[in-house]
Amino acid sequence: MTDLILWRHGQTDYNLQGRIQGRVDIPLNDTGREQARRAADCIAALGPTRIVSSPLLRARATAEVLASPTGLSVEIVPELAEKSFGQWEGLKAADIEKQWPDHYATWRAGGDLPQFGIEGRRQTAQRVGEALRAIAADAGKDDVIVAVSHGAATNLGATHLLGMDPQQWFGLRGMSNCCYALMRTNKRPP
C-alpha cells in the first residue's frame, strides 16, 4: 500500500484577511511558519519517503519545513498549484458577493465563471487529481508521499481521485491551513 498525505500550506496574510489567493504568490506569515513546524513534526513521524509541492511560495515553504527533519528534498510539481481565481484574486468573498451577487451565487453553487478568468472546477480537479494519481502510481509498495498544495486544489484533486463530480461535491470541507489528510492506495488484486 502507498500512503498519500495531502497537506495544505500554512497560514498567509491573505488567509488571515479572508482574501482569495489563487495564483498570487503570497508567503507564509509567522503563524503559518509555526503551523508548518508543528504539522511537520507529526507528518515526519509517519515516515515520508517523498515530498512533492506546488510551485507557489506558501506551499514550498511549508514543504521545506518537513524536508529538514526527514532529509528529503522537495520536488516541485506545477500541476499541484492552486486553482486560478482570475480577476477575483486578492479580493474578499464579501466584496465579490456585493459587486457580482449573481455570479457569486453561481460560483458558490459550483458553477464555472470563465468570463472572470476563473479556472473551472472540473479542469482543476482533473489537473491536480491526475498529477496525484501519477505520483502514487510511481510509488513503491510502502512509500509515504507528502503532497503539499492548496485548499481548492487539494479538495478538487481528492474529488477527482474518488471519482466524484466536482460540480456537485465539494471535497474535503474544513481542511484549514496546515491540516492534512491521508489517502491510501490498495494495489492488491480484488
Report the location of each language-model feature.
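Generic beta-sheet signal
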Residues: L4, D143-G151
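Glycine-rich phosphate-binding loop signature in dinucleotide/nucleotide-binding domains
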Residues: A44-G47, I135-V144
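Amphipathic, non-transmembrane alpha-helical scaffold segments
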Residues: N29, R33, L56, E97, ...
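Active-site-proximal alpha-helix that buttresses catalytic centers in soluble enzyme cores
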Residues: I5-W7, Q11-L72
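Short active-site segment of divalent metal-dependent hydrolases/proteases
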Residues: T12, A153-T154
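Short beta-strand scaffold positions
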Residues: S53-S54, Q126, V148-S149
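Domain-level recognition of soluble alpha/beta enzyme cores
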Residues: M164-P189
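Phosphate-handling substructures
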Residues: S68-R127
